[in-house]
Amino acid sequence: MKVMASVKRICRNCKIIKRKGVVRVICSSDPRHKQRQG
């Protein structure tokens, strides 16, 4: 999980979602693409 100031999609499988007011990126193809804004 990377904590980034601005989250971006790295590949086409990345999805940007918002959980409890926190913007996150989840990826089904590569778990290393997981990010959260903070």
From Swiss-Prot:
<dbReference type="GO" id="GO:0003735">
    <property type="term" value="F:structural constituent of ribosome"/>
</dbReference>
<dbReference type="GO" id="GO:0005840">
    <property type="term" value="C:ribosome"/>
</dbReference>
<keyword id="KW-0689">Ribosomal protein</keyword>
<dbReference type="Pfam" id="PF00444">
    <property type="entry name" value="Ribosomal_L36"/>
</dbReference>
<protein>
    <recommendedName>
        <fullName>Large ribosomal subunit protein bL36</fullName>
    </recommendedName>
</protein>
<dbReference type="GO" id="GO:0006412">
    <property type="term" value="P:translation"/>
</dbReference>
<dbReference type="GO" id="GO:1990904">
    <property type="term" value="C:ribonucleoprotein complex"/>
</dbReference>
<comment type="similarity">
    <text>Belongs to the bacterial ribosomal protein bL36 family.</text>
</comment>
<keyword id="KW-0687">Ribonucleoprotein</keyword>
<dbReference type="InterPro" id="IPR035977">
    <property type="entry name" value="Ribosomal_bL36_sp"/>
</dbReference>
<dbReference type="InterPro" id="IPR000473">
    <property type="entry name" value="Ribosomal_bL36"/>
</dbReference>
<dbReference type="GO" id="GO:0005737">
    <property type="term" value="C:cytoplasm"/>
</dbReference>
